[in-house]
């Protein structure tokens, strides 16, 4: 049969320091996620996927800095307003998209856009959120600084009625 083997339950993988450190009340957190359709950018040159609305935001052809209504009010920003997302030693310029249900104090950006080498379809689509990543901050970081500008970048959204016929947004506790 088989010989005895000694097994350790300790993993050699370390959790990045940002996920172990609680953020302060005024500190913003960055969450990096793959785009639900073009993933890490490998499908950025597929026009059908670009035209498909993203599940929550209904955005097409672009990525944006997703923030909650309360965070947008606190920062004084509006939809389509450009902001600089800055972490120590790295930054990216992104348009804002306000998303009800997004966690307060968290800015989510989707990866896969802003590629320099792509085909005709994907050229010029979105911003490079990968510029905010490091090997220790692959999926998120705390200490994000958001610097607003007065420039705007139009975003394509397939939602016809932003207020949904004057109905108030669904509130949750």
What are the functions of these language-model segments?
Residues 1-173:
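A cross-kingdom feature strongest in bacterial/archaeal respiratory oxidoreductases
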